A protein has these predicted regions:
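A structured binding-face within diverse protein domains that lines the active/interaction site
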Residues: 1-161
């Protein structure tokens, strides 16, 4: 199962057809990144300074419910488009979500937006580190199973926790 589509591969790979007609937006308040600290992975929550919603560029594939049999390889779902890292906390790893401005998100969703225009939007979207802040959060976000989805997971914790 894939959860992201690399921007540098999205326009020339399996994702190309979805880049043409399967664009979607994944709304978010922020995202997590894990940093190695004291021999363990410490999660950080990254969010915009102005607390405005984020618009992650996404690609979606949804089978046609009216089709007698869905095309081979069709899987319902979506992936987040990721971009190359440029350094700093937003880029702890080599990839990060492709965050679009509200205007870029609107154009991304517009069915009239061509493949070339969508490519231009994706290649020119920029996430500026100074527009975000980040803080340590509880390692409980790493746990799977029941009870792993709680608003407190997005609250800052102290350095000694």
């Amino acid at each position: 199962m894939m959860i992201n589509a690399r921007l540098d591969k999205a326009q020339t790979s399996t994702w190309k057809a979805l880049f043409r007609s399967g664009r979607c937006i994944v709304p978010a308040d922020g995202w997590y990144e894990w940093v190695a600290e004291r021999g363990r992975k410490q999660p950080y929550y990254i969010q915009p300074n102005d607390a405005a919603p984020l618009f992650f560029a996404g690609l979606s594939s949804v089978a046609d419910d009216h089709a007698a049999e869905p095309p081979a390889g069709t899987v319902d779902g979506f992936v987040i488009v990721t971009d190359a890292a440029a350094g700093g906390m937003l880029d702890v790893h080599d990839r990060r979500p492709l965050v679009l401005s509200p205007q870029e998100a609107q154009a991304w969703l517009d069915p009239a937006t061509t493949f070339d225009e969508a490519t231009h939007i994706a290649n020119n979207a920029r996430t500026r580190p100074e527009d975000f802040h980040w803080f340590r959060v509880t390692p409980q976000v790493n746990r799977s199973g029941a009870g792993n989805d709680d608003a407190s997971f997005n609250q800052p914790i102290g350095d000694d926790e």
